[in-house]
Amino acid sequence: METTKKLSVLLCLFFTMNQAISESDSDEHMATFCNDSSGNFTRNTTYNTNLNTLLSTLSNQSSFANYYNLTTGLGSDTVHGMFLCIGDVNRTTCNACVKNATIEIAKNCTNHREAIIYYFSCMVRYSDKFFLSTLETKPNTYWSSDDPIPKSYDKFGQRLSDKMGEVIIRSSLLSSSFTPYYLMDTTTFDNLYDLESVVQCSPHLDPKNCTTCLKLALQELTQCCGDQLWAFIFTPKCLVSFDTSNSSSLPPLPPPSRSGSFSIRGNNKILVGMILAVSVFAFLGL
């Protein structure tokens, strides 16, 4: 009987920790930009009320779609806003990400008339200017692995450029798909490593501007991080990422306690798993 009670407690612990891991992975904050040049608004004004309404609506709508845009107010009190979740995340993850983003953008850009916030799974933006169909690549943010591509990955730079160029062209044909402009491709090279390529544009861009946005984002990403295991750039209108970190040819994972490294997204899962395993044996007295 005592053992059964202990197992029940451990199961509750496991599911709680697993939920925390999932939320942590999906809600990784990348950057927040509060645009000072657009001016400020005063609290308790009509613009402030319209902004609060817009952010609340975006948060609610993220339960039903991976993309949504909205305009509230009239004249100088008009606020335009949108959110975009990465095409492969589910609605639960999208909603959690957008909910956090709307809270944080309001908290960190308290009186700014324009701001944008990026997470790994989503972005949220608002402005007093209409921006939906405009091509923009700034402000952007990128993250990358701390570990370089192994020397055995022959001609990686050229292969990355060629493959991403192909994926960008294919994605421009997906303007009317269920998830517009989103495309993920996995290609194996030399039976040695897999290259996962992901691109996505804001649905309001036309195919030409989507292609241009992705090419400019790729150019910036390869210049900064083209020799890393993985890299990811998020711009106001598109995103580009590549990943080889799941390749079977890579050496064993480094110790999870290594701080300050983003080499492998998900190291925390390994650490939590180890802690949970130790807890099980200790709790049961094994």
From Swiss-Prot:
Glycans are attached at residues 35, 40, 44, 60, 69, 90, 100, 108, 209, 246. It is a single-pass type I membrane protein. Residues 21-265 are extracellular. It is found in: Membrane. The chain crosses the membrane at residues 266-284. Pfam families: Stress-antifung. Residues 1-20 form the signal peptide. Keywords: Glycoprotein, Membrane, Repeat, Signal, Transmembrane, Transmembrane helix. Residues 285-286 are cytoplasmic. Its main location: membrane. Residues 29-131, 137-247 form the Gnk2-homologous domain. Belongs to the cysteine-rich repeat secretory protein family. This is Cysteine-rich repeat secretory protein 57.
